[in-house]
Each structure stands twice: as structure tokens, then as C-alpha cells.
């Protein structure tokens, strides 16, 4: 079974609730679906956290290398793509697009073998997992309503990120956290994401350590991206001295970039993003390397239904996974699938799909509405 085509389906027309911090709007294309088509009529679907214009440029490089390759050997084929592009955007748009191709190939491989990706990765350690509802921070009064809605939807873990946190005053930071804890109560886990990968992040180690101490007073589960994303030394020091877990690494790509962060214990929890790190093949290797060093794997997932489906297969296959990220609400998640596969149970858990490939049935009307394109009919 050979690869005969790779198609890009750019998504526009929606954002996560609250919009984007960096000025993007509904007409911006930040997510691109990737479809891999085989000569036997079976297709797979992937997702990339990158604009279609960058993906188009990368596809011009990668397509000639991928066409004619086996459609059911994702790890080997995508390693070939990595190895063949050291001088062509390594770590950037090239790696991002390889992520989407890899996810799509695993989806296709699962369909051909009639197995979920998690089983093909080595086996399933769990059949469900706790999602944390991921939402943007804002002023306390508005935030309160968003939190109430997330709890009403069944979330028992919620992460608040970016917005004014760390950008106005320490007093406002604590008011936001205090309001959040008061709103959700003691039984809902709360995580805080400072968004240190934002433009011109102003804070360093001392701010992060002092803020982490304040967060401990409110029972915060972890403190995410309190420093700039390349501050390895700062993270090592902060992780050693903070009383709560420190998390980061969502902007890194390729397994090699994660090695010093894992081996130097720069974070307590590591957060690769499957839609840009290199796909399922690469992220699984990162997760298991972290596991060998007693660092918890928590996939970053500010993405689409396809990305969330890939994350669910990953957390099923990693021994110590405890959470998966779920943007809420998000049309690129709920509107791209048929049925209600992301419904939470009474414990606030998501079932991990057991069907072939990524395990979900895509909504062709939803995909066409946001991309203006149709999926290729698949024989499986």
C-alpha cells in the first residue's frame, strides 16, 4: 500500500472561547488538517498547529520524498523525512508538517489493521482519562462565568492560561486565582499557565518562584510556562525549589530538543504538542524517555478534534499518563466529529476511543464548513 497524495485542509472561521491573546481572529488560519491518501483507497487524517501557507511551503519539499512510500510504516517514513531535511526548515514548518503526516499515517495504519493507534504503539494502559478543560484567563468577573460553564459541562480539572496573568500586577494575579478557587470549589483541580512563550515575556526566576508560592496557597496542581521557553537553566533552578510541579516545553520540536530538559530534570511534567513536535512517532519516544526519568508526560493540546484524538491514543499507551488537554469550548473539536465522543462521564473522565486508527468518525460537513474542502472518500 503506497502513498499517492497528501492534501492540506486549512481551518478558518473559529477560535477558542475568548479568542486569541496575540491578536488573531476567526479569519486567521492557525490549524491545518492533513490527509494522506493511499493507492488502495484508504485515507488517514492528521492535524498541524501551523498555518496552511507554511504547510504548503513544507509540502513542496516533503511531497516528493513521501509519494510512493509505504502508507503503513509511519515511524520509518517520517524518520526518513526528518533525516532528509536537516537543511530545510528543521524544527520549524517542516517538522510541523511531518507531525500531521505522521498522525495521518498512524490513523491509516490503524484502519488497515483494524486496531486503535494506542495498541499499535504497544498497548493500552487505560480506557479513560481525566481531561482538563483549558480556557483563557480574563478579569475575575468574566472568568467566573467561564469556570462555572466548564464545571457544568463535567470538567473536574481546569487550566487557566495567559490573559492578564503576570502582565498587570501581583494583586490581580492573586485575585484571579482566588476567584477561580472560590468558583470551582476544593474538589476541582486547578492549573495555572502563565504563558511564558508569549511575546516579550518580562519575568524571570524570582517572579516565578514568588508566584509559585502564592499558587500553593490555593492548591494549584501545576504552574505552566512561568519562564521563557528557552530558559533551561532557569527551569532547572525553579523546578528544584518550587513547592508545586513546574511544566513546560510545548514549543519545542523533535525528540532531540527534549533530551536536555528531561535528562537535567528541568521540569516535573513535560508537555510536547503532537501537532508540531513530529507527530505520534516522535511524541511517543519523548514520552517514554520522560517516563524513564520519572517525569510525567502531559500532552499539550491547544488544537483540533484530530489532535485531541491523537493525544488520547498517546495517553492510553504511556504508563503514567494522568491528564489530557481539552480546549473548551472549541468548534474545531466538537464540530469536526460525528456523535458525542468527547462527552465526560460522571467522574469527569473521557473514554479513549477503541476503534481503528484514531478511533473517531469525522464530520464531513463540519470539516467542509471550516476548510471549504471535502475529505477524500475512504474505503475503510
Language model regions located:
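Flexible C-terminal active-site loop/helix
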Residues: 1-15, 25-26, 39, 303-380
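Conserved, mostly hydrophobic/aromatic
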Residues: 3, 41, 62, 101, ...
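Short Gly/Pro-enriched turn/cap motifs at secondary-structure boundaries
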Residues: 22-27, 152
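Metal- or metallocofactor-binding catalytic centers and their adjacent structured scaffolds
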Residues: 37-112
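Shared catalytic-loop signature of beta/alpha-barrel
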Residues: 57, 213, 219, 230-247, ...
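Glycine-rich, aromatic-flanked loop segments that form ligand/cofactor-binding clefts
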Residues: 93, 102-142
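Metal-dependent enolase-superfamily TIM-barrel catalytic cores that perform enediolate-based chemistry
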Residues: 128-237, 241-242
